[in-house]
């Protein structure tokens, strides 16, 4: 009898869990492609026109407020700010992971809501601080960026991301097996492989969300130089903790409390912004 009662309780709990999972799976996203969505992104320009955003309609506080921003195609833009300053919230609106609550976000001169979602997201690559490597060879992991990439394209992407040297140092090179989650490579190596994977997509906008945090300053500088020399037409948006990672950017934004408090070049901000200094 005790066994039967335990089985009954487990069945009841399982049924409730299954019901909740079904609710999640059946939930429809508000983010859908429009009918006849635009299938080409002209360039990597990005513009925020009086954008405010909150994660829930019921939320009282805005995560972003009154954001006006104009990034020309091919520019490098750095974003600095403390934890909770909504740097990541800002960049998530570009590939339309969320929609702005108020105002409009433009990519390539068009409202992001006009694009076919797959098209937009194929042209806006985001590399997170904690990205994911899958179990499989380095080649297989990189080809998540472009399944049809040639070996030469893989190697070029890794050279730009400063990953080629350490990959070639492995006995099996690009055929080295990566454990689930990338546990057999260092944090900095993992970040560089994830950057290389994003580069294989040849995006018009490349966003690095603190994704060189585990990389030493010398390698970080080499990555920035490679970007400037080899992909000048790609718009680069770099969220960083180190000023050195963005001091050579065309524009640097200083954020706090969901607002842009200061913007300009490193020299302009050093001269005019107390919070930056």
Model feature map: region roles:
Residues 40-277:
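ABC-type nucleotide-binding domain
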Residues 31-32, 168:
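Transmitter module of two-component histidine kinases
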Residues 5-6, 33, 88, 105:
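Residue-level detector of alpha-helix boundaries and kinks
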Residues 23, 30, 143:
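Conserved E/DxxT/N motif and adjacent residues on the DHp alpha2 helix
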Residues 1-24:
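Cytosolic ends of transmembrane helices, especially the final helix of ABC transmembrane type-1 domains
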Residues 34-39:
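Short, solvent-exposed loop/turn elements at beta->coil junctions and helix N-caps
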Residues 11, 28-31:
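Signal-transduction coiled-coil helices of two-component systems
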Residues 7, 27-28, 272:
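Generic structural signal for alpha-helix termini and adjacent loop/cap motifs
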């Amino acid at each position: 009898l005790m066994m039967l009662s335990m089985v009954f309780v487990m069945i009841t709990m399982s049924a409730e869990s299954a019901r909740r999972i079904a609710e999640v799976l059946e939930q429809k996203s508000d983010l859908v492609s429009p009918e006849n969505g635009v299938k080409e992104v002209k360039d990597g320009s990005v513009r925020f026109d009086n954008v405010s955003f909150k994660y829930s309609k019921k939320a009282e506080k805005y995560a972003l407020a009154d954001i006006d921003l104009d990034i020309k195609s091919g520019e490098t833009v750095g974003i600095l700010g403390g934890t909770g300053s909504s740097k990541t919230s800002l960049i998530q609106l570009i590939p339309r992971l969320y929609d702005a609550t108020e105002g409009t976000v433009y990519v390539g001169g068009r409202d992001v809501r006009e694009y076919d979602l797959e098209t937009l997201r194929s042209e806006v690559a985001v590399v997170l601080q904690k990205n994911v490597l899958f179990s499989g060879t380095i080649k297989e992991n990189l080809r998540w960026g472009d399944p049809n990439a040639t070996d030469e394209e893989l190697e070029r992407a890794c050279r730009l991301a400063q990953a080629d040297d350490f990959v070639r140092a492995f006995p099996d090179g690009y055929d080295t097996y990566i454990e689930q989650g990338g546990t057999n490579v260092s944090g900095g190596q993992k970040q560089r492989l994830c950057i290389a994977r994003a580069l294989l997509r040849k995006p018009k906008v490349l966003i690095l969300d603190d994704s060189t945090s585990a990389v030493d300053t010398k390698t970080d500088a080499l990555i920035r130089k490679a970007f400037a020399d080899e992909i000048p037409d790609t718009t680069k948006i770099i969220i960083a903790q180190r000023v050195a990672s963005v001091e050579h950017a065309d524009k640097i934004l200083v954020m706090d409390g969901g607002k842009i408090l200061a913007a300009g070049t490193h020299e302009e901000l050093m001269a005019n912004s107390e919070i930056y200094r």
